[in-house]
C-alpha cells in the first residue's frame, strides 16, 4: 500500500525482500518460513506431504463432491500428455477452507471436460523463497517448468494464491524461462488466447473462469448462494502486484446475489494488509497479526453493520488461513472462503442430484 501512495514510486515490498535476504544470510530467520521452504525443496510442497498423501486427500475431496452433488469427478495425477498442468498452493489440499476451494476447481474442470492433471512433484504453487532469498525463489519455482516439460503439457494453469502469483508474474520468466517448450495459452473451451501469459505460459484461474462465464460456457444458479452475504478482500499480490481486480469480482457477481463492496479506499489497489502474510502467520506473532490486520477487519465490520455480511471472499491461500483468525477476533460470525468455492456452490453440473447443502454441508436456501 505504501508503494501506491509513494511519490517516488518506490516498491516497498522489494526493499523488504532485500532486507529479509540480508538477515537470512547472517542466519536470522523464522522457522515458519524456513521449514516450509525446506519441505518444498525436499518433497515439492510446504507441508512435506508425500505423493500418497496428496492422492488420498484429492480422493477424499472427490468423495465429498459426490456426496454433495451425486457426480463423481476425476482425480488426474501425474498424467502425461494432458493439455494443462494445474498448480495450486498445498494448503488447498489439506487446510480448510482451502479444501473447499480445491473442490471447486475439481468440479469446474470436470464439468467443462478439461484435459488437465495435478502433480505430486510440483505439488506447491506457493514459494516461501520469496521470504528467504532470490536463489531459493528460483530453486522452488523451477520444479513447475520441470514438471510441465516431463508431463508434456501445453501450458500451465494456476490456482488461487497470493505470493505464488507475484513470483510467477514478476520473476518466473527471467529466473527459469524462457519456457519455449510450452505453447502460448489458449483456452480449449472458448478459444480465447491469453496473450498476457505469452512469456510465462501460465494463466491465473480467475482469468480462465471469468472467460468461461463471459462466453456462456457455465450454467450457474446464484440462488444457491443466497445464504451467503459476501464481501471481497483484494489480496496484496494479485491486486497491487498484478492488477487482478475485475476477474474475481466478475465471477462473484455471476455466482451470488448478495455481494457488497467495502469502502472504496480499502479495496483494489488501496487494499489493506491481512496482517500475517510473508511468513508471519505463526502464533508467536498473534498480537502483531491482530494489530496489523485491524484496518482490514474494521472495513469488514463496516459492511457487516450496513449489509449483514457473513462471508469474506479472497483469492489467496495465506489469506484464507490468516483472515479466518482475524475475523474470529475482530468480527465474529464472518467466515472466509475462496472464489471458486462460491462458484462451485452455484455451478449446475451435468447429471447432478438435487442439492440441499453447499460444499461445507450448510443448508442452502430453496
Model-identified regions with their sequence ranges:
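Local cysteine-cluster metal-coordination motifs and their immediate loop/turn environment
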Residues: 1-10, 88-93, 122-131, 135, ...
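Iron-sulfur-cluster electron-transfer modules
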Residues: 1-176, 180-187, 360-366
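Short, surface-exposed connector motifs at secondary-structure boundaries
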Residues: 2-3, 149-154, 229-231, 303-310
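Redox- and metal-dependent alpha/beta enzyme cores, enriched for Fe-S-associated oxidoreductases
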Residues: 106-112, 119, 214-218, 227-288
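A polyampholytic, Gly/Pro-enriched intrinsically disordered region
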Residues: 137-140, 217-233, 279-292, 353-366
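Short, aromatic/basic amphipathic alpha-helical patches
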Residues: 171-178, 252, 323-330
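Short, flexible loop segments at boundaries between secondary-structure elements
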Residues: 181-222, 264-269, 328-365
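A short, acidic, amphipathic alpha-helical segment used as a generic capping/interface helix at domain edges
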Residues: 288-310
